């Protein structure tokens, strides 16, 4: 597998740094830029190409959902994965309906580390912890 470039959209510097350190464990994943807002991410993508956008559900200037909608409209072939601090099947379902290829919980580092390569291979990935919640109907919808 070639090295895949990632744009991380995350406004919490401490979490972004921790995620960068964790992703450095996989030589096939390279975070090429960190954007602290949705607008910064859009500006970056106007100038540069990446293989994957990993975006926070909550950003200071717009919601992650609003950014995801813009990304899907402007870059429909660009895979996006949503990160969230909330265990919410409703949020996950909404993100996936809008085109996200993954929904991962921030406090599940192993899930993030395992999920990103799967998303890059074209799979849909939802954190195991999130899939274990809710009814079987909701779980089926997420799969």
Model-derived features with residue positions:
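Conserved acidic carboxylate
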Residues: 10
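Acidic, metal-coordinating helix/loop segments flanking the phosphotransfer/catalytic sites
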Residues: 34-52
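Acidic catalytic/metal-coordinating carboxylates
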Residues: 37, 63-66
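Active-site residues of response regulator receiver
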Residues: 56, 84
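The feature encodes the CheY-like receiver
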Residues: 60
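Short amphipathic alpha-helix used as the core "switch/output" element in two-component signaling
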Residues: 65-77
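Short, flexible helix-to-coil linker/hinge segments that flank and couple to helix-turn-helix
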Residues: 92-97, 107-143
């Amino acid at each position: 597998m070639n090295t895949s470039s990632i744009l991380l959209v995350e406004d919490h510097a401490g979490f972004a740094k921790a995620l960068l350190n964790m992703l450095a464990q996989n030589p096939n994943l390279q975070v090429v830029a960190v954007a602290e807002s949705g607008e910064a991410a859009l500006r970056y993508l106007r100038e540069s190409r990446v293989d994957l956008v990993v975006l926070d559900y909550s950003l200071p200037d717009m919601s992650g959902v609003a950014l995801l909608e813009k990304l899907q409209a402007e870059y429909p072939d660009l895979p996006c994965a949503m990160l969230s601090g909330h265990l919410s099947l409703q949020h996950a379902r909404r993100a996936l309906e809008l085109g996200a290829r993954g929904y991962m919980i921030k406090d599940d580092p192993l899930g993030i580390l395992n999920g990103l390569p799967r998303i890059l291979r074209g799979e849909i990935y939802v954190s195991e912890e999130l899939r274990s919640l809710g009814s079987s109907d909701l779980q089926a919808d997420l799969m």
